[in-house]
Amino acid sequence: MNFAACRWCTPLMLALGLLFLAQTAFAQPPAPADGTIPPEAMANRLVNGSFECDDAGYYTGPVVEGREILIPNGWDVFTNLELPVLYSARIFFEQASDPVNGGCETDSAHVEKLDGRDSFYLRARDLETLPAPGKPFDVALVQQVATVSGVAYSLSGWMVSFCGGSFNAPNDCPEGYYMAKMYGTDPTGGLDPNADTVVWTENRNNFNDGRWRNLRVGVTAQAMTMTVFARVDSPFRWHGNHAFMDAMTMVQAPTATITASSTISNPQQVQVAWDGSLGPDISLIEDGAFVLLYEIEYWHDTFGVWRKLETDFLGAGSHTVQVGCLDTAYRFRARVRAEQLTGTGVFPTQRYVGATAEIEFTPAAPPQEPGEPLPGHPFSIYLPAVSAQPEC
């Protein structure tokens, strides 16, 4: 399936081994590609991510259900199916409340929003019109953003969907039906939301299961532009299906560093240490109180899975792990995200996925000192019991 488009419808870092009285491995964020210029720091790299009618505004598109749709300035629209109703939520509901005087400047209607005075409204055709209300739709807002290849970026935004309308006593959305709220990015700068290069995050919860949902994804740019997609896929025909988007943001991602070391005196004790940075953008968010939270994990091929050392660890730290094997490679990684602790900072809070730092480290066995057999005694070989061998 191909999206239709037009103006309105348009290292892993391997560580360097250091050997002095201890062995050490170190990983840090990747550097921008040669010849690139670091991007200018800004609190939000998206244009019109709050969808405010009285700020960045909207432009008109084609007629749907008797009137021209409204599309946020700075964004294009792509659709797999027939276009649904798209509008400024503020203007739509103000005009529904007062067709003569209602508009962007009035405040007489309830508007579903999270940030500012407005949000972006997406609504199925024939919302409550028999005999086939709530036509399926699959539509995305699309914006290209200047990036630097090799630099990680993080997207975070909010959506809410209403399958079966907003009535909740009870809500009648059939079991198995859903509206997929999706936030994605193509790190190659491609414009096709159906391409395999797009990295997606998705949430299918209805409004009565958590209301507004935060969607977030982190990606390393592979080109001079990255394409952002804010999408709602409503694949089932059901009455009342509609959704809202608000508070969409993109920043240069937070970064992490990680080291691993062991001493000759105790080579099976590996100390893992980590640190990181919010990056140049997040610190510019007005009234923000963002901190770094880490997940620290390690891997050995005999495990087959990553094992956790720390979860939601606040700030820089260290952890000493007892390894069971020497002269064999372990991998350690630090996964970082930036968010605000409960009750702090600016609303709505965003959660920014950071670039993962990963290293490989091989704790070395101490050198064996040569021994001499006792005079006149043959030497013996002792084989240890397999069950007594430590787990790697």
What are these regions (language model features)?
Residues Q268-G288:
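Conserved aromatic anchor
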Residues V323-G343:
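Beta-strand-rich modules
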